[in-house]
Design a protein with these regions (language model features):
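C-terminal edge and immediately downstream basic/flexible tail or linker adjoining helix-turn-helix-like DNA-binding
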Residues: 2-6, 47, 140, 158-161, ...
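Helix-turn-helix DNA-binding module
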Residues: 130-141, 145, 149-166, 177
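Amphipathic, Lys/Arg- and hydrophobic-enriched alpha-helical face
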Residues: 31-49, 66, 132, 177, ...
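Short, charged helix-capping/linker segments at alpha-helix termini
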Residues: 3, 20-29, 39-58
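Short amphipathic alpha-helical boundary/capping segments
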Residues: 14-18, 127-136
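Internal acidic/polar
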Residues: 8-9, 90, 97-128, 195
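Sigma70-family region 2
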Residues: 20-21, 46-47, 57-75, 94-96, ...
Length: 197
């Protein structure tokens, strides 16, 4: 049992190797570390909260079943995000291209606790969410994976089973649309900060 206390200090590659050897607690640590990031990616891709939770769970189950395929060439988080992205695309296609954004719940209200900077950032995030919803599905997926999910263009292309050049085009068009939509009326900061903010 002494090894359990060292799991949080271990690198993802070490945890994956332990998980491949049957250590469920090691895989549990990977889920604890990366679960929120995977759910967040799925939400940015357009999944409702409950769907994002279900798809994240499915992604980690698939990752557990395929853990011997993880070689550590990239990060574990990028690997499991690619799995999650593929599951989301499959889910989206099965839904016969139903507009998943139509039923998206309204964002939670901005809490004003006296910190104007925090309130401003919350408002920017809401604006960004609305701007992302205005993109075509393929643009939103590519922008969400590359900027919100931290995947490279090549990793996003693999996750979406789409040619690399197409992903790059979708990202460029999506960012151009976001810049136009989010540009302050009289100039100011650009969308790049807001996308990463």
């Amino acid at each position: 049992m002494a090894l359990k206390t060292t799991l949080p200090a271990m690198h993802d590659v070490e945890l994956a190797a332990l998980a491949a050897g049957g250590r469920r607690d090691a895989f549990g640590e990977l889920v604890r570390r990366h679960g929120s990031a995977v759910r967040g990616l799925l939400r940015r891709m357009g999944a409702e909260a409950a769907t994002a939770d279900d798809l994240a769970q499915d992604a980690f189950l698939a990752a557990f079943e395929q853990i011997t395929d993880f070689r550590g060439d990239g990060t574990f988080q990028a690997w499991v995000k690619r799995i999650a992205a593929r599951l989301y695309v499959r889910h989206w296609r099965k839904a016969a291209h139903v507009d998943l954004l139509a039923e998206t719940p309204e964002p939670e209200g901005v809490h004003h606790d006296g910190d104007e900077g925090e309130a401003h950032m919350a408002a920017l995030r809401i604006d960004l969410d609305e701007a992302l919803k205005s993109l075509a599905e393929h643009e939103r997926l590519c922008v969400s994976l590359c900027y919100g999910g931290g995947l490279s263009h090549a990793e996003a292309a693999e996750a979406l089973n789409t040619p690399l050049g197409t992903v790059k085009s979708h990202v460029k068009r999506g960012l151009d649309k976001l810049r136009r939509r989010m540009a302050p009326p009289e100039g100011g900061d650009g969308v790049e900060r807001r996308v990463h903010g």
